[in-house]
Amino acid sequence: MTKRVATIITVSIIVVICISVLVSRSFSCNGGPSEIKNPDIFVIADAFDIASLDPAYGYDTASAGQIQNIYETLVEFHGNSTSEFIPSLATDWTISEDGKTYRFKIRDGVSFHSGNPLTPEDVEYSFERGMVQDYVLGPQWMFFEPLFGLGNYTSRTDNGLIPLEEIKSKVEVDGQWVQFNLATPYEPFLQILASSWGSIVDMDWCIQNGDWNGTEESYEALNNPGPGGSPIHSIADGTGPFMLELWEPGIAVRLVRNDDYWGAPASFERVVTQIVDEWGTRKLMLGLGDVDCAFVPNAGIQEAKEMPGILVYENVPTLLNQAFFFQFDIDLTSTLIGSGQLDGNGIPMNFFSDIDVRKGFAYAFDWDTYIDDALTGYGEQISSPIVKGIPYYEPDWPSYELDLVQAEEHLKAAWDGLLWENGFEMTLVYASGDITGKIACEILQNNLFEINPLFKINIQLMGWPTILSEMVLGRLPMYVNGWTADYPDPHNFVFPYMHSKGVFAQAQRYSNEVVDDLIEQAISSSSHSERQILYDQIAELYYNEVPSIMMSQILGVYFFRDWIQGFVYNPIRPVYEMYAYYLSKG
């Protein structure tokens, strides 16, 4: 038996985001309407470059933003909803009564940018290819878990790679339909399919460019590529409304309209994302109308709101958190740990394995100053990775507060007193263009120095793609990063932050079997009360273990020129590298 899914399907998951109520919209106009510049081009000024154009590899918002303009998924989120879906490359779909079989009818008459027609075999290939590639810190864990069962997050096992035939058995073609065979019911599965990692690629084009050719040998050769190692890392061939013209890393991404798009043509002939590190330069570009929207750091919000001709969306409820991450086993090749010894001129590789170090750092952070000065009030402290607006969030979970006395006690106890006696020197890292991250590092730097002048923190900015690759290699002793929801369920927050196979925990070399077990119990339970108890326990363990320091949940503020029309905010979608198809100027 199957239950028929209508054109718009609502997933039975609790979501408490009311965007239409919470988003406020304001204009800052001076001297009448602005004269529209470049009416056929949508121009974005962003601070962050993309990591990859490969949908199976890219797992950052900058990459996802470009991918969603070039590629398409089987279904897409409906407007601002995180739980309703409309057809995209699938025209219809069914879900079996037991929740373990998903079937999608593939749209006829669609072509890739290469000119090749879309077929059900392309869809099957796209998901099998993603699991074959399975970049260690990529998004593929979200497919392995529902398709292979809880506790299965990767193609790699202690006995080698999962047999290719097992991967192929999970996605099958049946005429014009493609069927997913899940190992377990999995409520967020449609949310996962609707995001950038669910994008459909051109099988023939991929193979022509050296990608997986369907064989075991190719599987072994292409599994877990290094940074930039995907055969389609810097090229693209989707079915979407825009085509890749050029990606110049660190400079710009340029897209052109797909005039053969199966849907209505996009309003813009081109979409250009310029990578501009400095806020002052982005501010000038936005004010002159040379760009249509720009990433505005929190420190620049007030002056941007006062600029003429600007449309502002503020108090936007995001599903985004920020944190300091500790590296539990720093790679020997790191250049950010000084001498590599606890001699006052560096730190040892396992510096943060001592819980008193982690607790001392946590008590040394000043949340009030950070939220007031760095975020200019557009944020709030949260105590665990689970953000407000997600089911099972509880505001009374235990959390750290600034307490330099407690910080001193823990740092005196760390490393049997040797840390306090000798001091240390290390480097904190934040992303280029992230002014709030810089301020967070400075707060910690100053407070630790106040506790003991022998505690020396250096601060260094890095480009976003470099941070991602260095994070994977374990070379960053401590760094600022964040997480935005892949889908609106607490599992999507606790897994990356705390499970030993999660993207952050794995990069940090953090592992706790008790935590892993609780996380797996929570996602497998269908009982609301049981899940609440389990997430309460997970939040308490996060507090006790301090695998990272949760800094804040962000309230979004977005800035456009007042001639931009059609913007609909969805907390699951990236914003500044936004879906330009629905936008226009007028």
What is the predicted role of each segment?
Residues T2-V43, D49, A56-T61, Q68, ...:
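N-terminal hydrophobic or amphipathic helices and topogenic motifs
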Residues R4-I9, S20-N30, F77-G79, R107-L137, ...:
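Extracytoplasmic/periplasmic ligand-capture domains
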Residues K37-P39, N69, S88-A90, G99-T101, ...:
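Extracytoplasmic
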Residues A45-E97, E128, I235-T239:
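N-terminal lobe/hinge region of extracytoplasmic solute-binding protein
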Residues A56-Q66, E121-V123, L193-G198:
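Short Gly/aromatic-enriched secondary-structure transition segments
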Residues E124, G138-E217:
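Surface-exposed binding/hinge segments that line
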Residues M551:
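Active-site-proximal polar cores
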Residues Y558-G586:
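Long beta-strand-rich cores associated with HINT superfamily self-processing modules
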